[in-house]
Amino acid sequence: MTASAVLDLVKDLIARPSVTPDDVDCQMLLAQRLERIGFQCETIARGGVTNLWARRGAGAPLTVFAGHTDVVPPGPRDKWDSDPFVPTERDGFLYGRGAADMKSSIAAFVVAAEEFVAVHPEHPGSIALLITSDEEGPAVDGTVIVCDELRQRGEQLDYCIVGEPTSTEALGDVCKNGRRGSLSGRLLVKGVQGHVAYPHLARNPVHQLAPALTELVAIEWDQGNEYFPPTTFQVSNLHAGTGATNVVPGEAVALFNFRFSTASTPGQLKARVHEVLDRHGLEYQLDWELGGEPFLTPRGSLTDALVSAIQAETGLQAELSTTGGTSDGRFIARICPQVIEFGPCNATIHKVNERIELSSLAPLKNIYRRTLENLLLAD
């Protein structure tokens, strides 16, 4: 197959305005193609979210490609140079919402699977795709419920490639072999409202909160490790008061977030925060939300297979990185021992005029195919 096979499929996918959680039959299109080459396809739907689990083969190892058909809203359409849902070729690029994040990755892997099966119809092991329409949104009815279903059924995943756009300057320069965890807190500090002229009759929660926050911001939570930078603490929102200048507020609210490595646990971070707040004598309520645990795939079979495929196709030695935000890899890592993320350049994701280089489509497909060969056909 030629690069046009990937391009044609990408265009079909971009033309479907699949803003979270609407799939707009993207997965039906994928399933139809996969069924023609022997995949057993299953839809797992909940809460308006569509998920596709497609598997070919019953043996081990099971190599999975994970991705999402949903896209973020395009924003003001008059800011785009062309309709975000009309795939447009211009100046060596393909424009459209989802071009980089991540419909090109999905199309490239589907065509890679078609090529691989055509040459190796009786290949060892199994190939599967896990596709959701709920990655860019709440992510509560998407990949996480498919992983729960697979766990209950006893389907053992061995390797997973998540098609997130990880490349930065050139296709193949960066892979993500892990991601930091995300832990958020909503801190409500209680005071006593009153008149600013009579502070002795009030208790200002802002004045009480400020030194505690100053201490939290200055803490070195850990030093990171070989794969992760140190854990970070960031205050994202502060709110207090009625809007009047003569009223001491009765409460103050701070929202904050940790991006943490495997060098710290959520329990350790929570305990240290509570220790600081208690020591400052605050009357408070603190609600926690764990967005995801960190995961890490050390160098091994999967990283070697992908890195060697990238080098064979592009000549680049890919960097293994754990930077960036969370992804669905955090759910898959619970049931799969080796997870890695790899896809096209990410410079325009979520932006107006999102695009991908046309010349990168064939190499992306070839890298995925070579990775399958390295994992399933190795002696």
UniProtKB/Swiss-Prot annotation:
EC number: 3.5.1.18
PROSITE patterns for the chain: ARGE_DAPE_CPG2_2 (PS00759)
Molecular function GO terms recorded: acetylornithine deacetylase activity; cobalt ion binding; succinyl-diaminopimelate desuccinylase activity; zinc ion binding
UniProt keyword NAD present: no
Ligand binding (Zn(2+) 1): H68, D101, E164
Coiled-coil intervals, chain numbering: none
Binding site for Zn(2+) 2: D101, E136, H350
Pathway participation: Amino-acid biosynthesis; L-lysine biosynthesis via DAP pathway; LL-2,6-diaminopimelate from (S)-tetrahydrodipicolinate (succinylase route): step 3/3
Required cofactor(s): Zn(2+); Co(2+)
Gene Ontology BP term (one): L-arginine biosynthetic process
Keywords noted in UniProt: Amino-acid biosynthesis, Cobalt, Diaminopimelate biosynthesis, Hydrolase, Lysine biosynthesis, Metal-binding, Zinc
InterPro entries: Bact_exopeptidase_dim_dom, DapE_proteobac, Peptidase_M20, Peptidase_M20_dimer, Peptidase_M20A
Catalytic reaction list: N-succinyl-(2S,6S)-2,6-diaminopimelate + H2O = (2S,6S)-2,6-diaminopimelate + succinate
List of catalytic residues: D70, E135
Cofactor note: Binds 2 Zn(2+) or Co(2+) ions per subunit.
Assembly information from the UniProt record: Homodimer.
Entry's family note: Belongs to the peptidase M20A family. DapE subfamily.
This protein's name: Succinyl-diaminopimelate desuccinylase
Organism encoding this protein: Bordetella pertussis (strain Tohama I / ATCC BAA-589 / NCTC 13251)
Gene: dapE
